[in-house]
Amino acid sequence: MLSQIERNLTNPTVAVLWRLANALGVNLADLLSADAGGRPAGGIALVQPHAIPALKSPDGHCELKILGPIELAGRFEWYELTIQSGGVLASEPHEAGTQEHLSVLSGAMSVQAGAEERKLRHGETARYAADVPHAIRNGGKATATALLVVVHPA
């Protein structure tokens, strides 16, 4: 995985980054952002748009904004996913029992999980196993956005 990341062949999930950071003894919040957006005691933490970390696919057609706090990585992750026309976000299987929930906010996308594929339009949500090879595509002419939630097994 490290070799693939270094060669820009894959984008790691937050869970993978979290495990790597723990193995290396590095604070993931410091790695991804100077302002981790932690919750102050008794207050509301506001994370400015410039402080939200983002991952881009090697071809630049897909962007994942990491909306969830780093301390939940490996349990729950949520992202704002933007895919340009013709873009594909392909993923290898995550650990057994992992589920993804994709809610299309604008445009249209298709989801493939294993051998099954479904098309989604604005406002629709797909829930699917992510412990098999899976991909999210934008086959339309316009940019599409979605909320992607990854739930890891307990």
Report each predicted region and the residues it spans.
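Recognition helix of helix-turn-helix/homeodomain-like DNA-binding domains
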Residues: 1-12
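Long, hydrophobic alpha-helical segments
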Residues: 14-17
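A short beta-loop-beta micro-motif enriched in histidine and acidic residues
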Residues: 72-76, 87-101
